[in-house]
């Protein structure tokens, strides 16, 4: 007993020390009899007991136990007897152990996972009697046998496959784990085996995620002939193979390639060829009840969603297929026609991918995908507007556009002549409503019933390059040799041999032509070509005989949910465009029987009566987003149910024949009342007109998709799963692939740069010149600017040093806003910028905080001139003399400025010196400043007498229209105002009656400009119009109509807010524009300029942008240039947008 006590223990648990009780007696031994009949027989002749009583283990057995600590003693003795006298006997013994005694997995060396499982099963309390140890071993074996049987019974049966088809080959390096007594020849067939089937799948992947184990431990290579283990594959291959071995959906054929002429030892590397085949089982999953292609939601556990075992398996099968396709370079086909043409020219040239050829494989990975191919792997890049180019290109390929045969509307319907691309667009729009144009060679490629479902990818069956086919020249895959393509949905794991097409959608779309290409004319042409539903008549709606209807039909007609206005198209537009659309309708329509009605301002008491009860209802009803929103809000407050909308009389009581949304991106934010209201409107056909379907976020498209009722994408769950979530996870390519596939059939976009079939631009526009004019701040502006700049830099540096720049975000933006305002006019300080989302909420008190500009100017500032102004009697005497000399019949007599020689001088800009000589104000001030810089006394240019600008007179027209003289107030005008006045004067001199548009993002600045221009110019020389969001519809209409009328005697200037001017206005009557201040986004300014430079413009367009030299405006231009080069960022969320804005702010404060 003492000897036993000193013997080295072989187990970590005391209770296991005497638990191995088996016998080794000829045919009753474990080698020949797997089932032990009686524990008592084991105890009687237990070799373990014999060793415990005094026999020492041999060195061979000790070495064997060191490698295989759980090997049974009788097995170890038998292996010792067989191999102890042979060279490499230990390696051969280990190999035979795994070949012969591991088949039932009873004695296999447990992985870390099995050890944990075994320890749990074998753990017993310390106070258990020792005679239970023997029972424990037998019980443990029985449990393992039962577990194996039950797990085998639970596994789904491997479905029989009727055929398999080759998809690709890999050459894989395998590490040898078992030695061989003889070489494994070249061409020897090998097989995969999944070991440790008794370990739960979930536990395997949990350990894999924790990086405690790899799947390579569970995937082994065996000889196909004698099922002898050879080695293990690399981890990346194991991750592909492990989930796919469980089912007969993917078949692998393995062949020994190298070395083939020598015995293998543990640790050697060999090369095998892995040929991959897809089987018929993969394409018949719907017939296999054990597999679900639906994305389950898992089971709920304590309120959380837990992935089921089956869902885990299906997910990893999908991942295995994706990784396999990547490895074998099986890429989706993007353009089937182009691919087939290329295939015909080049033939099929598949290759075997050698994963060990680092150089060739590295070159493959670095290759750019072909134009007709898309890599399966998701590429993550910075998301910007440049990536939107691919989105737009998907809808504007030359092949697609050129295939559209022009449709010319009859002249009795459409008064104007459409351009060729507009006629092609009309063809496309009619097709989108399911109307056959009747062309003999009509291209049916646009039919979305043949378009591939966007969740699916098309793959080509490659030529069979398997080892068996290359060696025998026989395919032998029992598949249809005529098959060229197969289709896979890598999101759900479904595969099909038939093309999965989209559900037929023929009820509208998105016309997304670039601004200025005439979307309005195109839409109205569609309305005039097809003004009503041809398949519906008033008689069929209201006077059908009940005998011809089923009972269900009669009930449906008796109580309709909404009345069908089958002759009316509803067009919803921004308020500023309401009258413009009405004018365009009158301009285009040549059929007196088709009319247009405005639905605005309560002019229609009952829209339902107008559209349903009248024999000839209006063809078009024009209304605004505001009217739709107001009606919806009222119905919501009244508690009106959607089902009972038919009982109301407004816009929601009707199902329209067609609804058209102009500037459709207005509904992009699905949470706004406007968007919710528009989505509740009812119609048979739905159209969206927008030049910018995406503005800030990819989700901008969702409301458009929901309005168009594109199923299943209009369901928020689908949209989030396949677009929003990948986008937020920065899988931009995946999100855009799906979006492109969704939008391609329903969106048409043309740009001004595109060319027609003859190589000419779609539209010939006159040239456009944009000039940046840099100005210097006035002295007063400069003092104020420097003060605000110091404050802004102090706040920025403080936030940068403390690391809380985002916390000071709003404060910094206010400082920047004030700097921009000072560059325009210091009187702007304290007003809002309605275009800035971060400052337009009105919650920021810093914006509206009053600032006394006078306190910012140093007290030490000396008066420019110490000469006192006039005394009262002096002023009166001078006024009396000048009036008699220069005013006749309430007009300033013609007089020439001797400085600039301009004649006559405008009374509003004339200044009279004390010596009674008249000059232009700008000329005299410039002359005075020059004299002062030279430290010379200011003298009259005419008589050379000493003069002082503080002692001069100016002309002013009172409210009664009488011209009078007043003391000249020599306050300094802001730099931009002076520059604008100078350019307007030059235009008056060179181009009489020229109409001018002045843009600014500050509505308050427009007020200042209006006041200042009216002070400088008389009404008979210059007329100022102002157009911003504060005007009513009537006022807007009057402003635009009056401005568009050319008057050669009066110069017309339209002051336009950037926000109002960026939407739909047609201002081709003007050819000059001035941008008074820059904005962060260059696209917003481009939209405004396109109001002038668009179809209908006959003159060259010149745009002058005023920028203060060396100011924050100059740096804003650099940000604009950067955005034009790199693309404007699209943000995933609010935080992302703020971070990008902070980057821009940092650029502003860079030296």
Swiss-Prot record:
Its main location: cytoplasm. Residues 35-54, 142-161 are annotated as: Disordered. A motif (DEGH box) lies at residues 662-665. Residues 979-1146 form the Helicase C-terminal domain. A zinc finger (RING-type) spans 897-944. Gene3D superfamilies: P-loop containing nucleotide triphosphate hydrolases (3.40.50.300), Tandem AAA-ATPase domain (3.40.50.10810), Zinc/RING finger domain, C3HC4 (zinc finger) (3.30.40.10). GO terms for cellular component: chromatin; chromosome, telomeric region; cytoplasm; nucleus. It is found in: Cytoplasm; Nucleus. Residues 148-161 have a biased composition (Polar residues). Transmembrane segments: none annotated. Residues 39-49 have a biased composition (Acidic residues). CDD domains: DEXDc_SHPRH-like, RING-HC_RAD5, SF2_C_SNF. Its EC number is 3.6.4.-. Pfam families: Helicase_C, HIRAN, SNF2-rel_dom, zf-RING_2. GO terms for biological process: double-strand break repair; error-free postreplication DNA repair; error-free translesion synthesis; error-prone translesion synthesis; free ubiquitin chain polymerization; protein polyubiquitination. Keywords: ATP-binding, Cytoplasm, DNA damage, DNA repair, DNA-binding, Helicase, Hydrolase, Metal-binding, Nucleotide-binding, Nucleus, Zinc, Zinc-finger. InterPro entries: Helicase_ATP-bd, Helicase_C-like, HIRAN, P-loop_NTPase, SNF2-like_sf, SNF2/RAD54-like_C, SNF2_N, SNF2_RAD54_helicase_TF. ATP binds at residues 513-520. The keyword Cytoplasm applies. GO terms for molecular function: ATP binding; four-way junction DNA binding; four-way junction helicase activity; hydrolase activity, acting on acid anhydrides, in phosphorus-containing anhydrides; Y-form DNA binding; zinc ion binding. Disulfide bonds: none annotated. Probable helicase, member of the UBC2/RAD6 epistasis group. Functions with DNA repair protein RAD18 in error-free postreplication DNA repair. Involved in the maintenance of wild-type rates of instability of simple repetitive sequences such as poly(GT) repeats. Seems to be involved in maintaining a balance which acts in favor of error-prone non-homologous joining during DNA double-strand breaks repairs. This is DNA repair protein RAD5. It comes from Candida glabrata (strain ATCC 2001 / BCRC 20586 / JCM 3761 / NBRC 0622 / NRRL Y-65 / CBS 138).
């Amino acid at each position: 007993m003492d000897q036993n006590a000193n013997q080295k223990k072989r187990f970590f648990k005391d209770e296991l020390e005497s638990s191995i009780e088996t016998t080794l007696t000829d045919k009753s031994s474990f080698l020949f009899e797997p089932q032990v009949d009686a524990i008592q027989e084991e105890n009687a002749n237990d070799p373990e007991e014999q060793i415990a009583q005094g026999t020492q283990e041999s060195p061979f057995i000790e070495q064997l136990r060191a490698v295989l600590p759980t090997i049974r003693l009788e097995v170890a003795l038998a292996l010792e007897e067989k191999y102890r006298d042979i060279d490499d006997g230990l390696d051969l013994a280990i190999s035979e152990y795994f070949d012969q005694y591991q088949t039932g997995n009873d004695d296999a060396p447990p992985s870390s996972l099995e050890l944990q499982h075994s320890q749990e099963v074998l753990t017993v309390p310390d106070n258990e009697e020792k005679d239970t140890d023997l029972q424990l071993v037998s019980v443990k074996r029985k449990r393992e046998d039962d577990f194996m049987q039950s797990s085998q019974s639970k596994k789904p049966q491997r479905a029989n496959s009727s055929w398999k088809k080759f998809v690709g080959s890999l050459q894989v390096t395998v590490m040898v784990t078992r030695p061989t007594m003889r070489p494994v020849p070249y061409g020897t067939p090998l097989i995969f085996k999944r070991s440790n089937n008794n370990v739960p799948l979930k536990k395997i992947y949990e350990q894999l995620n924790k990086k405690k184990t790899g799947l390579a431990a569970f995937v082994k290579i065996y000889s196909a002939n004698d099922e002898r283990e050879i080695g293990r594959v690399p981890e990346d291959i194991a991750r592909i193979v492990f989930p796919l071995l469980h089912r007969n959906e993917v078949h692998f054929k393995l062949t020994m390639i190298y070395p083939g002429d020598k015995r293998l030892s543990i640790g050697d590397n060999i090369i095998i060829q892995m040929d991959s085949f897809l089987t018929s089982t993969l394409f018949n999953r719907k017939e296999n009840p054990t597999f679900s292609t639906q994305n389950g939601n898992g089971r709920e556990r304590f309120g959380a969603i837990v992935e089921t075992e089956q869902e885990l398996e299906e997910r990893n099968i999908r991942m295995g297929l994706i990784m396999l396709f990547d490895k074998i370079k099986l890429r989706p086909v993007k353009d089937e026609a182009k691919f087939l043409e290329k295939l015909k020219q080049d033939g099929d040239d598949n290759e075997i991918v050698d994963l060990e050829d680092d150089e060739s494989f590295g070159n493959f990975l670095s290759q750019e995908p072909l134009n007709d191919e898309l890599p399966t792997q998701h590429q993550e890049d910075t998301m910007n507007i440049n990536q939107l180019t691919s989105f737009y290109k998907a809808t504007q390929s030359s092949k697609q556009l050129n295939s559209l045969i022009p449709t010319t509307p009859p002249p009795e319907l459409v008064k104007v002549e459409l351009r060729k691309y507009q006629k092609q667009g009309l063809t496309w729009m009619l097709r989108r409503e399911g109307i056959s144009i009747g062309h003999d060679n009509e291209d049916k490629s646009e039919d979305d019933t043949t378009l591939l479902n966007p969740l699916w990818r098309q793959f080509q069956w490659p030529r069979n390059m398997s080892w068996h086919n290359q060696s025998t020249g026989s395919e032998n895959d029992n598949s249809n040799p005529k098959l060229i393509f197969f289709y896979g949905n890598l999101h759900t794991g479904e595969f099909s041999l038939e093309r999965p097409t989209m559900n037929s959608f023929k009820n509208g779309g998105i016309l997304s032509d670039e601004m200025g290409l005439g979307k309005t004319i195109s839409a109205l042409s569609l309305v005039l070509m097809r003004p009503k539903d041809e398949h519906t008549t008033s008689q069929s709606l209201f006077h059908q005989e009940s005998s011809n209807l089923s009972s269900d039909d009669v009930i449906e007609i008796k109580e309709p949910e909404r009345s069908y206005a089958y002759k009316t198209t509803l067009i919803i537009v921004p308020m500023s465009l309401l009258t413009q659309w009405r004018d365009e309708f009158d301009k285009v329509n040549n059929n007196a029987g088709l009319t247009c009605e405005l639905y605005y301002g309560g002019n229609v008491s009952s829209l339902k009566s107008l559209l349903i009860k009248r024999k000839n209802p209006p063809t078009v009803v024009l209304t605004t987003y505001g009217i739709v929103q107001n009606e919806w809000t009222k119905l919501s407050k009244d508690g009106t149910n959607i089902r009972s909308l038919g009982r109301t009389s407004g816009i929601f009581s009707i199902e329209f024949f067609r609804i058209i949304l102009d500037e459709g991106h207005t509904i992009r934010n699905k949470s706004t009342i406007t968007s919710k209201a528009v989505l509740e409107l009812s119609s048979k056909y739905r159209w969206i007109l927008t030049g910018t379907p995406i503005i800030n976020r990819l989700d901008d498209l969702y409301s458009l998709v929901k309005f168009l009722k594109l199923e299943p994408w209009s369901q928020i769950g689908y949209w989030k799963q396949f677009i929003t979530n990948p986008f937020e996870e920065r899988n931009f390519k995946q999100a855009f692939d799906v979006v492109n596939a969704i939008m391609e059939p329903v969106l048409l976009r043309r740009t001004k740069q595109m060319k027609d079939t003859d190589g000419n631009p779609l539209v010939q526009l006159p040239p456009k010149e944009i000039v940046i004019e840099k100005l210097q701040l006035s002295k007063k502006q400069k003092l104020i600017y420097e003060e605000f700049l110091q404050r802004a830099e102090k706040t920025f540096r403080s936030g940068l040093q403390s690391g809380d720049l985002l916390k000071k975000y709003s404060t910094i933006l206010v400082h920047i806003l004030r700097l921009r305002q000072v560059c325009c006019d210091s009187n702007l300080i304290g007003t809002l910028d309605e275009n800035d989302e971060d400052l337009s909420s009105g919650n920021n008190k810093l914006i509206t905080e009053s600032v006394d500009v006078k306190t910012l100017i140093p007290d030490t500032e000396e008066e420019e001139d110490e000469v006192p102004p006039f005394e009262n009697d002096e002023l009166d005497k001078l006024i009396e003399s000048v009036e008699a000399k220069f005013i006749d019949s309430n007009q300033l007599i013609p007089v020439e400025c001797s400085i600039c020689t301009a004649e006559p001088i405008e009374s509003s800009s004339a200044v009279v010196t004390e010596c009674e000589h008249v000059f232009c104000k700008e000329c005299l001030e410039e002359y005075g400043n020059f004299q002062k810089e030279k430290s010379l006394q200011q003298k009259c240019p005419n008589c050379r007498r000493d003069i002082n600008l503080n002692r001069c007179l100016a002309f002013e027209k009172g409210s009664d229209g009488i011209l009078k003289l007043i003391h000249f107030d020599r306050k300094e005008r802001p730099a931009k105002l002076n520059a604008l006045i100078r350019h307007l004067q030059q235009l008056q001199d060179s181009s009489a009656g020229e109409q001018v548009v002045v843009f600014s993002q500050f509505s308050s600045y427009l007020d200042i400009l209006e006041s200042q221009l009216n002070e400088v110019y008389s009404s008979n020389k210059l007329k100022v119009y102002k157009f911003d969001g504060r005007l009513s519809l009537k006022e807007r209409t009057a402003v635009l109509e009056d401005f568009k009328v050319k008057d050669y005697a009066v110069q017309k200037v339209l002051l336009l807010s950037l926000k109002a001017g960026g939407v739909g206005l047609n201002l081709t009557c003007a050819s000059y524009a001035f941008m008074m201040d820059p904005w962060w986004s260059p696209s917003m300014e481009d939209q405004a300029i396109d109001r002038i430079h668009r179809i209908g413009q006959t003159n060259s367009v010149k745009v002058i942008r005023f920028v203060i030299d060396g100011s924050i405006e100059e740096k804003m231009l650099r940000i604009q240039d950067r955005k034009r080069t790199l693309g404007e960022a699209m943000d995933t969320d609010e935080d992302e947008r703020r971070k990008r804005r902070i980057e821009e702010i940092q650029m502003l404060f860079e030296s």
